[in-house]
Amino acid sequence: MERIKELRNLMSQSRTREILTKTTVDHMAIIKKYTSGRQEKNPSLRMKWMMAMKYPITADKRITEMVPERNEQGQTLWSKMSDAGSDRVMVSPLAVTWWNRNGPMTSTVHYPKVYKTYFEKVERLKHGTFGPVHFRNQVKIRRRVDINPGHADLSAKEAQDVIMEVVFPNEVGARILTSESQLTITKEKKEELQDCKISPLMVAYMLERELVRKTRFLPVAGGTSSVYIEVLHLTQGTCWEQMYTPGGEVRNDDIDQSLIIAARNIVRRAAVSADPLASLLEMCHSTQIGGTRMVDILRQNPTEEQAVDICKAAMGLRISSSFSFGGFTFKRTSGSSIKREEELLTGNLQTLKIRVHEGYEEFTMVGKRATAILRKATRRLVQLIVSGRDEQSVAEAIIVAMVFSQEDCMIKAVRGDLNFVNRANQRLNPMHQLLRHFQKDAKVLFQNWGIEHIDNVMGMIGVLPDMTPSTEMSMRGIRVSKMGVDEYSSTERVVVSIDRFLRVRDQRGNVLLSPEEVSETQGTEKLTITYSSSMMWEINGPESVLVNTYQWIIRNWETVKIQWSQNPTMLYNKMEFEPFQSLVPKAIRGQYSGFVRTLFQQMRDVLGTFDTTQIIKLLPFAAAPPKQSRMQFSSLTVNVRGSGMRILVRGNSPVFNYNKTTKRLTILGKDAGTLIEDPDEGTSGVESAVLRGFLILGKEDRRYGPALSINELSNLAKGEKANVLIGQGDVVLVMKRKRDSSILTDSQTATKRIRMAIN
């Protein structure tokens, strides 16, 4: 009562009433907020308020000489008043319009080059298609996305050096341009920007947009590639989405997409080889994506995906500390655990040795189509809050979390034996055994889990064992939420180690990744992936193996030929012949190999029977472990095009066809390259044609090193001796003549001498 009297008393004074009714801001904190600091607190209001003034812009004094005081309509363009606190002039927005219409023109040739990213964006939007708007609840989760389409992938430091070199070439300061991409970009930009009149600062800023990946942590539902993110504000709101198809693709998105496909293919292939880690490294180093070496892309590209991270770990690069299980990325947000080996019995009384995590922990789980928060204790799921695009996605997340919890009722829900194997036919580890089992059929798991009554909590509902939603009951500890769980935002990278089976561990020994986690999804790469490694020949099927094997022999014919005559066993063991074995029927591989090796031995022993085409044709068959038998073959079978096709031992066939006149080899109708036979192969003149200018001294002499090919002879100095491999696969010792006059007689004597040297 007293307070009210006091207030009435105050209000009776006219000054009080005036202050309270006329002054809008009456709170010190608010006044402080809007008046302290240089940061503009309400930029859009400030802009509107400024633009409502007559002269909201300041300009350099020179403007008064270049722009008239009034325009054609008689409106004043600038004020004679100076700007307070600077020696600039106050200018009307109309002056800008006048300048744009009547101001001086400069060359516009550099604009599309400097503002390349903007011009390209306009093109993408022009050709993009906007579809209907749908109103529905948007489950958005914050993900780290690329907001800058069309960039290269240089690090900030690399880009800085390039920009300094292009924009301020004469500035002092050490700049080291080392990487291939730095040098290429610098050269290209220097040429493009010759005589450029645009302010260097602007050029530098625009170059940065082109060279460096910029990422932001944004709420997204739907596409995350940069061409979708640039229109995020047009395609998704809180309760609506608009369908959109970009009007063009950008290289950075294509690289990200192709990198993931290449990495998945490589990890899958490496996992089944004898030494997975060595194979993986060999393939990463010999693969190109869109003409750039894969290892260079891996060093610069921050894409986080299981296969990509395994490749990075193998190269000794740092990766994210989160771990992967069942296709979900787990990040521990609190708690800790210790690991202990325990033996558990499944519902089928099979013993599983499992590393049990003891202790209370909380995780976020982020997958492609669902996200969740998981709280667990030792072998017990305390709570799981899931959100997902659809019922199927929610179910996937629940299965992964149930298996991860290691609960007893999950282990007991196993029906039948667990014997899942990976691509290399090795048994999966117990946790992945369980995962595969329930991914196939989770009915028993869900039925046995148990259900509970639930309280009504805003934004959450229950889910029953048959995946129907309910507000009364739910599977124990499990709720479905409308809100998504944000991806882990940190870009922190940690040092990891990798073992030869491609299991990646952090420094405390926790497994972060393994080949089991690599997705089996097949996609078509946007950029050409060139796998030079023979291990990847089979990726495009049997025909590709066949063509690649023969192309490899032809490309390396000079060395292959020497090995064929001197060290055949080493040649037969070459890994390049490994993929070919899968084309040869298993039952007969050994016999074919024995037969071909015997045939080759005869060729080495009998003068004049060396036959380039035949050696190339049959060589891959000799790579299998040979079985000695008396069997002779006139044709050998390979399994391509879904059936057995024949390669004739003597003569051409649709599989292997050599055209003597054009010297072209075609495999299954595809060109496999040019095959240069030894001159006049199989005729006695071969030696003379080859050995002009050399004197034949006799049989091979090991003291003079390994046999050279005919092509390598030209490097000999006059009077120098060497062993040389001649047409028939025989090796003789020769000396380069000291005088050129006697060359003619060499041809006649060569034949006789070779016969003597060999026999």
Swiss-Prot record:
The keyword Transferase does not apply. Gene3D superfamilies: Polymerase Basic Protein 2, C-terminal domain. It comes from the Viruses. GO terms for biological process: 7-methylguanosine mRNA capping; cap snatching; DNA-templated transcription; symbiont-mediated suppression of host cytoplasmic pattern recognition receptor signaling pathway via inhibition of MAVS activity; symbiont-mediated suppression of host gene expression; symbiont-mediated suppression of host mRNA transcription via inhibition of RNA polymerase II activity; viral RNA genome replication. A motif (Nuclear localization signal) lies at residues 736-739. It is found in: Virion; Host nucleus; Host mitochondrion. It holds the Pfam family Flu_PB2_7th. Its main location: virion. SUPFAM superfamilies: PB2 C-terminal domain-like. One of its GO terms (cellular component) is host cell nucleus. The record marks K627 as: Mammalian adaptation. Influenza RNA polymerase is composed of three subunits: PB1, PB2 and PA. Interacts (via N-terminus) with PB1 (via C-terminus). Interacts with nucleoprotein NP (via N-terminus). Interacts (via N-terminus) with host MAVS (via N-terminus); this interaction inhibits host innate immune response. Belongs to the influenza viruses PB2 family. Plays an essential role in transcription initiation and cap-stealing mechanism, in which cellular capped pre-mRNAs are used to generate primers for viral transcription. Recognizes and binds the 7-methylguanosine-containing cap of the target pre-RNA which is subsequently cleaved after 10-13 nucleotides by the viral protein PA. Plays a role in the initiation of the viral genome replication and modulates the activity of the ribonucleoprotein (RNP) complex. This is Polymerase basic protein 2. It comes from Influenza A virus (strain A/England/878/1969 H3N2). The gene is PB2.
